[in-house]
């Protein structure tokens, strides 16, 4: 019986064709050819990476900004010279800047890498600021520090930079919004505590401020200082560098936190996607390999005062002229952006300072502070300020709603993001694809993230004391010998021998053995034969890769568990704690900064002043007070209500944003101090004209409606406000004399 072949047979895949031609060996041959070609192309990418590294370091001002920039201030020309500079980012073609919008100033981290990551691509912190119409400035740095420069010198230079930005934008509707990434975040917070008048809203992304914080079973990086015996090793490394600390060691420390990615995944992604992955990989490696140096004084301050000493939140850092760095002095709203997927700055380290400084939310309010935080579920440390998706969502919403954040009443909020849809109430009032809602929180919400108990605090305090002892011993007995042996040529040689730098150098054209790779890669590209995706050997390759990652992750988990157990056991020893001057039985907080008695007296004086102002004001003050009261029942603020409220600035007298912010805060505090008196005073603040009161109440209802379906509590509060405004249940106006209870006073 003959079998007739159909003219409409399904097309054969490459793997099936190979099987037909070579039998069972076909897929194996295809895979072998592809693997050989990928190997050549992979090593050529590594060669390009090495050449790129050498070219980048040869630049006068190496950076990875994807925008054109013009120098405004060179920090090397200041009275206390530093290697920092202020540049203006030139808006790209097609970007329109509103001269009345507050400028954004982005401070990049100097933590081993060069500057520019905040403007690495279009979808970045710079990009979203431009999209929202803001002028944008950037604070960067050179690879080599100025002789003798200190962290305080850098802070003073950044103050000069901000003064210049403010002077360049006299018509802006607010002080600059300053973004600090990673190390740049804590540096910005220190400056804001000393010079609060220079700042608008502050956004700190992936920035540690509470360096001991964390939870057991995670966050092992915080144990490093204790396990190494303290900061003496930092001093030794600086001495071996001839008075400079090679930032490549910081980069290597980051890489050690994720051995699977460092040793395998990063390279495997290039190898397995060799035809498409190279440009993205090389673009990032340009930043990752752009190492910079720090002075010995700078890195020693960072390690001693911050990472081991944990003195920032405790208020124990002082400037050279004796001014204490107290984060409670910051008057601007603080936005904290962190992630559960960040193993460098976990949420506990980004937010723990709030628990260190304040007893409760009322304590935050008494300092006049507004703190907004948001926690991403998965993104890693670099993704917080590199990821395009994060830039479009979180950073984009921060930029679009920066005025809303600036006018939030004091307190603690969490920024929650919801996708905007056609069914979103008031969608036309929402800019972008997301609705950012600021929900009121308490300190219990921060505590729920987990953290240290009293025993953990004693362990870290003991490690800090031991670090001081070991550093003193090193400086007394070993440092003079090391410095005598390490001449400038020796220091330079040791710097070139740093393991990460060797990787870049050896896989570049500087190595004659790499010379044939470029020609071989060119031939491969001409005759490229990628394997089919359904080849069984590709599936085997993926399986092996996953097993390697799992093995490396298992090794990491094992070593981290051993490190944690060692730290907890050694520094939990009552004998060692007693020897270090730490009482093993003490359960009191070790790092609570003292209350400023003068400040407390000023707070009480301000409360009395606000109480006396409760009956004062006119229609504008009454409407704002009523809006705040109705919104307090909802427990959240979002851009829809704010966009509606913004119109009040023109309807009831155009107020500058700074004055509008003051008005909102004063009315909010009055409601907190004495809600009953504040509400009872509303009728006396309203005009006698029924139509004016009716229109004002319509505005309040419009704001409530813009924020979505009102709750029962919202309806109750709105009804109460309606009664006070003289509006009956059916919208009828109550005769003014029937609602006027408090004698009018001058505005």
Predicted features along the sequence, with ranges:
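Small-residue-enriched hydrophobic alpha-helices in membranes
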Residues: 583-747
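Short beta-strand/loop motif that positions the catalytic acidic residue
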Residues: 330, 336-338, 342
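Short, surface-exposed "cap/lid" segments of acyl-processing enzymes
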Residues: 59-145
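Conserved alpha/beta-hydrolase "acid-adjacent" motif
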Residues: 344-349
């Amino acid at each position: 019986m003959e079998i007739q072949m159909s003219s409409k047979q399904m097309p054969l895949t490459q793997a099936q064709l190979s099987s037909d031609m070579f039998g069972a060996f076909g897929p194996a041959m295809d895979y072998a050819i592809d693997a050989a070609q990928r190997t050549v192309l992979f090593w050529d990418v590594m060669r390009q990476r090495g050449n790129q590294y050498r070219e980048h370091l040869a630049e006068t001002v190496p950076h990875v900004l994807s925008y054109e920039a013009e120098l405004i201030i060179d920090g090397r020309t200041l009275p206390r010279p530093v290697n920092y500079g202020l540049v203006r980012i030139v808006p790209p073609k097609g970007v329109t800047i509103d001269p009345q919008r507050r400028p954004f100033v982005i401070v990049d981290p100097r933590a081993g890498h060069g500057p520019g990551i905040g403007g690495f691509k279009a979808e970045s912190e710079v990009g979203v600021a431009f999209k929202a119409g803001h002028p944008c400035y950037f604070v960067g740095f050179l690879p080599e520090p100025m002789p003798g420069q200190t962290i305080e010198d850098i802070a003073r230079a950044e103050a000069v930079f901000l003064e210049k930005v403010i002077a360049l934008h006299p018509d802006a509707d607010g002080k600059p919004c300053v973004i600090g990434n990673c190390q740049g975040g804590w540096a910005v917070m220190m400056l804001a505590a000393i010079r609060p008048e220079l700042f608008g809203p502050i956004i700190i992304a992936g920035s540690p401020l509470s360096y001991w914080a964390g939870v057991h079973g995670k966050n092992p990086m915080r144990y490093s200082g204790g396990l190494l015996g303290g900061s003496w090793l930092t001093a030794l490394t600086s001495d071996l560098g001839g008075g400079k600390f090679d930032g490549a060691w910081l980069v290597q420390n980051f890489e050690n936190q994720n051995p699977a990615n460092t040793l395998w995944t990063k390279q495997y992604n290039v190898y397995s996607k060799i035809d498409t992955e190279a440009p993205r990989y090389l673009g990032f490696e340009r930043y990752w390999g752009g190492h910079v140096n720090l002075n010995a004084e700078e890195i020693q301050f960072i390690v001693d005062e911050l990472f081991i000493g944990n003195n920032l939140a405790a208020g124990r850092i002082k400037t050279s002229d004796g001014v204490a760095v107290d984060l409670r002095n910051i008057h601007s709203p603080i936005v904290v952006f962190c992630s559960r997927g960040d193993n460098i700055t976990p949420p506990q380290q980004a937010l723990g300072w709030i628990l260190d400084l304040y007893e409760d939310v009322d304590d935050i309010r008494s300092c006049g502070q507004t703190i907004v935080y948001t926690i991403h579920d998965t993104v890693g440390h670099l993704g917080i300020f590199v990821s395009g998706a994060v830039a479009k969502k979180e950073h984009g919403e921060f930029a679009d709603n920066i005025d809303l954040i600036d006018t939030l009443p004091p307190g603690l909020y969490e920024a929650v993001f919801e996708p905007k849809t056609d069914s979103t109430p008031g969608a036309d009032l929402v800019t972008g694809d997301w609705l950012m809602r600021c929900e009121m929180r308490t300190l219990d919400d921060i505590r729920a993230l987990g953290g240290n108990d009293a025993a953990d605090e004693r362990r870290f305090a003991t490690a800090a004391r031991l670090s001081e002892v070991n550093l003193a011993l090193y400086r007394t007995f070993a440092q003079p010998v090391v410095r005598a042996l390490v001449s400038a040529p020796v220091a330079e040689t040791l710097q070139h021998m740093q393991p990460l730098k060797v990787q870049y150098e050896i896989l570049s054209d500087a190595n004659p053995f790499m010379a044939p790779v470029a020609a071989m890669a060119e031939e491969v590209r001409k005759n490229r034969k990628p394997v089919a995706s359904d080849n069984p050997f590709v599936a085997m390759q993926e399986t092996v890769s996953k097993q390697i990652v799992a093995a490396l992750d298992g090794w990491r988990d094992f070593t981290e568990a051993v490190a944690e157990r060692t730290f907890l056991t050694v520094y939990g020893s009552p004998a060692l704690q007693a020897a270090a001057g730490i009482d093993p039985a003490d359960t009191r907080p070790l790092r609570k900064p003292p209350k400023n008695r003068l400040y407390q007296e000023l707070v009480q004086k301000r409360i009395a002043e606000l109480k006396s102002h409760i009956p004062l004001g006119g229609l504008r003050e009454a409407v704002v007070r009523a809006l705040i009261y109705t919104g307090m029942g909802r427990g959240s603020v979002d851009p829809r209500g704010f966009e509606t409220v913004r119109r009040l600035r023109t309807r009831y007298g155009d107020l500058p944003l700074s004055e509008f912010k003051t008005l909102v805060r004063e009315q909010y505090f009055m409601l907190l101090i004495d809600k009953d008196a504040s509400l009872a005073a509303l009728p006396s603040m309203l005009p006698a004209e029924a139509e004016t009161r009716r229109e004002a109440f319509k505005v309040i209802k419009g704001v409530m409606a813009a924020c979505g379906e009102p709750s029962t509590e919202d309806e109750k509060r709105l009804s109460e406000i309606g009664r006070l405004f003289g509006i009956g249940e059916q919208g009828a106006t109550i005769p003014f004399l029937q609602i006027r209870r408090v004698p009018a006073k001058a505005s």
